[in-house]
Amino acid sequence: MNNKELIKLPAVKRITTFSSATIYRLIDKGEFPKQIKLTERSSAWSLEEIYNWIDQKKDERDGGDS
């Protein structure tokens, strides 16, 4: 996938079904993609990184190595 689309927190929450607190807790633990700081007051996530993270979780569930 070569998707450069950026998404905001509400979309990340919708895609993952996580709360804001869970997303930030996973980021702090290094277990979820970090947001990209766009301006002093605005951040977004790479949609591609979110989908890659989901694919990684599926692989872990299925016993895959990738």
Residue spans for each PLM region:
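Polyanion-binding surface elements
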Residues: 1-25, 49, 55-57
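Major-groove DNA-recognition helix of helix-turn-helix-type DNA-binding domains
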Residues: 15-44
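Short, structured secondary-structure boundary patches
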Residues: 43-44, 56-59
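C-terminal end-helix/capping segment
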Residues: 43-46, 51
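C-terminal secondary-structure termini that scaffold catalytic or DNA-interacting sites
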Residues: 59-66
